[in-house]
Structure formats: C-alpha cells, structure tokens
Design a protein with these regions (language model features):
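Class I SAM-dependent methyltransferase Rossmann-like catalytic core
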Residues: 17-32
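Conserved alpha-helix/loop element of class I SAM-dependent methyltransferases that forms part
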Residues: 30-51
Length: 255
C-alpha cells in the first residue's frame, strides 16, 4: 500500500478497513487490530467463536482501539480495562468510531487485582499484553479465571520469540541486539512455553494454540508509525528480526 501500511496475501477485511493514520495514532505495538481479527476468526473457524451479545473483558486494552473494534464488529459489550491508559481517552476513541459507553466502558484496573464480580464475563480478550502479567503461574487461576463464567472463553494474542531468550546465552543475534537487550526480551516466550504453562492448568481446556500468520505484517505496521518507541524497534525489523519474532494465538475455555 502506498501509505506504508503492509499488505498480506489474503484479506483481514475488518482491520484493513480502518484509516491507517488513526491506527498509527493509537497503536502501541504490533498492529493489535490484525492480531485480534485473526485470533477471533481462527477461533470461530474451529468452534470457539465469540458470541454476539457477550460481555467481554478486554484486558490490557491500551488506547481502547481493540475494545471499539470488538464492539463494532462482533456485536459485543466490552469493558476496556487498562492500568496505564486513561479511561476518558479510551471512551473518546470509542466515540470517534461511532460507539458509546453502552458499547465500550473503559475502566482503570490492574490485571493482578481486577475489581469485578465473580463470573461476570462471558469472554476475555487480551491482545499483545498477556505476557506482562500472565507469566506468573498463579495469574490465570487466581486473578483472571474467577471473573469468567464457566464455559466462557479467553482469547489471547501473545508476542513472543521462536526460542527462549536464555538460549542465546546472553549474546543476542545482531538483528535483535540493534534494538533490544536480553533483559528487554525476557518477557517474550516461545509458543512451547505457553503450551506447557496452560497444559498444567486444571481449570481450563486449551481449545487452540498456534502462531498467527499476520505477525510479520502487524510488526511492519507498528514500525511504520511515527513515534519514538516504534522508531526504536524499526532497526531490528529492518535488520531481519522477524525471523525470531512470533505472536501466539491461545484460546482457553474455563471448565
């Protein structure tokens, strides 16, 4: 595309319909609309779709863009929960996209101390945020699952690496080290590590786990943004870091 946003060999019809300038203004990492769309479409194709009318917790919602995306295209009601984002700003985003607080309700919340009733939500989405808090083995069972109804679904898109950062022995490949230190990459796990973590959970069933095919495109969209964080990551992507970077889709069902 001439505007610099990347393309793919098959369509992501919902996310590709958004104004690239708006997306660049609001995203904080690899394009979350594309990660969200592929995750939910793949889940639906394998029998774990997000039902219209559901009450959804969008955890780590950032600017609120993914929350508005969910409400607009999946006909769900969304509570947008984020520790660092401003709830008023997130509601402004929803209103810019033709929605209201009845569609998207932003709240200030810490993922490790969620202020919601037990079994309040039909589903949870967490797009490119779960690895900030979910690496704690106790998080899912003790902090998140109590707020999801039995039979409810959890949809995750988790940024990661093709291997554990420890496998590099403290010396990153140059295409990674030009932007990041080993310490900065410790929160990026390979898919296999997430598989082992979730397989050990007694209160969920893993419905789906795989790497997203839109990963490279989502990263390229991010480094095309005009902000210092994207600029800092751009050198790695231009040097070939996509050979190491992944995004893992995980779909869990509470038992």
């Amino acid at each position: 595309m001439s505007d610099g946003m990347s393309t793919r060999p098959y369509p992501l019809g919902r996310s590709n319909g958004y104004d690239p300038a708006l997306v660049r203004e609001l995203i904080m990492g690899p394009n979350p609309l594309k990660l969200c769309e592929e995750t939910l479409d793949d889940a639906a194709a394998h029998g774990s779709g997000l039902a219209p009318g559901s009450l959804v917790l969008d955890l780590g919602s950032g600017s609120g863009l993914t929350s508005a995306f969910l409400a607009a295209h999946w006909q769900v009601r969304v509570v947008a929960a984020d520790l660092w984002g401003n709830p008023t700003d997130a509601l402004v985003v929803a209103r810019r996209l033709g929605l209201s607080a009845q569609d998207v309700l932003p709240v200030h919340a810490d993922a490790c101390s969620l202020p919601f009733a037990e079994e309040a939500f039909d589903a949870v989405t967490c797009i490119d945020a779960y690895n900030y808090f979910g690496r704690d083995e106790a998080f899912l069972a003790q902090r998140l699952l109590p707020h999801v109804r039995r039979g409810g679904l959890i949809y995750l898109a988790i940024s990661g690496l093709t291997c554990d950062v420890a496998d590099f022995g403290g010396v990153l490949p140059p295409e990674l080290s030009c932007s990041w230190t080993p310490e900065q990459l410790e929160y990026l796990w390979p898919r296999g590590r997430w598989e082992r973590l979730f397989a050990a959970e007694g209160d969920v069933r893993v419905e789906r786990i795989r790497d997203l095919s839109c990963n490279d495109e989502a990263w390229r969209d991010w480094v095309a943004c005009d902000n210092p964080y994207a600029a800092g990551d751009r050198a790695a992507i231009e040097a070939g870091a996509l050979a190491w970077l992944t995004t893992t889709e995980v779909v869990l069902r509470r038992l």
